[in-house]
Structures are given as C-alpha cells and as structure tokens.
C-alpha cells in the first residue's frame, strides 16, 4: 500500500524489530524483577496476573505486529509461503492474547476482584473478538477454501484496513492497561517518580513507537517507484 509517503518500508521494519526486542525485555524486567515473577498457579495472585501483560505485549502486540509486517520483511519470498507465515503469526498472536486475557480473569476470580468493570477490559474483549473474526475471514477468503479471485480482490483492501484498525485498537488498549496498572500501584503506595514507575512509562512509550513503526511499514511502499494503491498481496 504505497500512499505517497515518500519513504520506504524497510527502515520502519528495522526500527520495529529493535523496538520489539526493547519492549519485550522491558516488560519481562518489570514483571520478573519488580513484580516478583510469573506463575500459572500461586498463593500470590499477583504472580498469576503478571502473565497477562507479558503475553498481551509479547504474544499479542509484538507477534501481531510482526505478522502485519511480514509482507514487507519478506517482499521477494514465495507468496504462498509468506501468506502462510502471515496466517500462522496472527494465529499465534490470537491464541496468546486469549491466554493472556484468561490469566487476567483467573487473577480476578481467585482474588475476589470484579471482572469487566473497566474501559480497558471492555476494549480488550472487543479487540480480541474482532481479531478472531478478522483471522477467520482471512483464513476462509485467502487460505482455505479460498474465495474466487475477484472476491479476493474486493475483500483485500477491507481486510488490510480492518486489520490495521484492530491493531491500532489493541495498541491503544495496551496503553490503557499500562496506565491502569500503574495507577493502581501508585494508589497503593508505589513511588510516582521511582524506578518502576519510570520503567512502566518508558515501556508504554516504546510500545507506541513500535506500533507507529508497524503501521508506517505496512502502508509505505517497499520501493519508492512502486505505483500507488495496495499491491503487496496478490489476489491469487
């Protein structure tokens, strides 16, 4: 999708990869060093909750972003192979996102905390639902059984547009999640200007930069001489 931005996709894919590594490292440091670690089962319910931000960021946001960029990262690869990688990465992101949401519910249920009372939780459920619908439609239309070429051609721009919308919604909700958790921690006595607070805020900023890089990489052309219009995914 070349939109006359005057820039190529490649620099933004490189930036996104670097920012993904940084964001993943930062959320792991936060969850393990500052929040005590991760656990599937524990008497310390906070350790169960810690699985949620790790899976949502690394599994849902980062892997989902890599899935979006795969046609830019591998522009000369066999189309069917690239399409399969795109499908698998989005499927992994969807599954890990769903598991991440499960651990948020598990923490709430075992801690006696109400579910689905915040805007973050509402948008989260809505986003994962839309992500699942998008994946199913993409699978049926472009992979198996596959629609007719003219149908693929008509669906493709909407598939891309809706996919970017859902991804941006997921990014926005991740920011809400960081804000909500940090607000809870600070209301419980966490130093507003302490190391952990700064780490959380900087992690959120890195996620914003990562998401912006992904979106620009998706809409910028692989080569500046590319014609305008969406063309990285053939209809066949």
From Swiss-Prot:
Monodehydro-L-ascorbate radical binds at residues 116-125. Its cofactor is heme b. Residues 33-50, 106-122, 175-201 are extracellular. It comes from the Eukaryota. The keyword rRNA processing does not apply. GO terms for molecular function: metal ion binding; oxidoreductase activity. Residues 1-11, 72-84, 144-153, 223-236 are cytoplasmic. The keyword Isomerase does not apply. Heme b 1 binds at residues 52, 120. Its EC number is 1.-.-.-. One of its GO terms (cellular component) is membrane. The chain crosses the membrane at residues 12-32, 51-71, 85-105, 123-143, 154-174, 202-222. Inhibited by diethylpyrocarbonate. It is found in: Membrane. InterPro entries: CYB561/CYBRD1-like, Cyt_b561/ferric_Rdtase_TM. PROSITE patterns: CYTOCHROME_B561. It holds the Pfam family Cytochrom_B561. Two-heme-containing cytochrome. Catalyzes ascorbate-dependent trans-membrane electron transfer by utilizing a concerted H(+)/e(-) transfer mechanism. Initial time lag in electron acceptance from ascorbate observed in acidic pH. This is Ascorbate-specific transmembrane electron transporter 1. It comes from Zea mays. The gene is ZCYB.
